[in-house]
């Protein structure tokens, strides 16, 4: 089975459960609080490992985040390439309303302190045909894409959170894009974000060698490449917390492809896994194991 390198964010999530998302000028009390492991990179690595893949996590944290390494190890994620020499780990302040919606404030911390020499040292351990999973919560993404491509890695990119500098990245070297309709419209500079077919066609045409996986909330998910277009409706589930839904989706889609499933099956398994995730509280801990999905 292919090795997977997830070079991404590692956050300490500080989660407040509230009646509703705080409004400007408003002060309210939470009815519960907890701290847990998170970050898109961490969540996606956890999803891949829980789906039964051979996954390696790389990134940077401070001593305050060492518990995250222990948790990842408990899910059989290899953590050898996580650097722990930063002062402060990334932080996420997460509000979760009673209807399961969330609002997130990020503080990058160590996530934007990854050096090119650290990246080079890590990439030495991976070779042609291995997967490189990236999100936009760390620095040097353009360097990672270029160096990963040089080594023949299969690059999967989730351009979230979207920033304008993404447009300067060597995106033509990406094999799989995981986007929602807003991110896809931003990449293609499509004005009408409600015209989902146009957005999907625009990003497919902009990157003809890539597979496009686009999620559209309650409209479900789409896969597009060449003349192939597949739609997967959502799977209804009670919504408790949507925090790691997208990360679960990406992890289980990639895991399904690596296991040999076709894109229709991969979309279904990814959607099913996300439905399980949103029915539970938390990020990494809410992601299901493979025996619940496949």
What are these regions (language model features)?
Residues 3-4, 24-91:
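Substrate-binding N-lobe of the ribokinase-like
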Residues 49-50, 149, 258:
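Gly/Ala-rich phosphate-binding loop of Rossmann-like dinucleotide-binding domains
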Residues 4-5, 164, 195-294:
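Conserved phosphate-binding/catalytic region of the ribokinase-like
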Residues 21-30, 178-180, 230-233:
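Short glycine/proline- and charge-enriched loop/turn segments
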Residues 48, 180, 246:
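Short, conserved phosphate/pyrophosphate- and ester-handling motifs at nucleotide-, phospho-/glycolipid
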Residues 13-17:
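Short N-terminal binding/cap micro-motifs at the start of the first secondary-structure element
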Residues 1-10, 70-84, 96-229:
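Ribokinase/PfkB-type carbohydrate-kinase core domain
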Residues 58, 105, 232-233:
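Hydrophobic residues at beta-strand termini and immediately following loops
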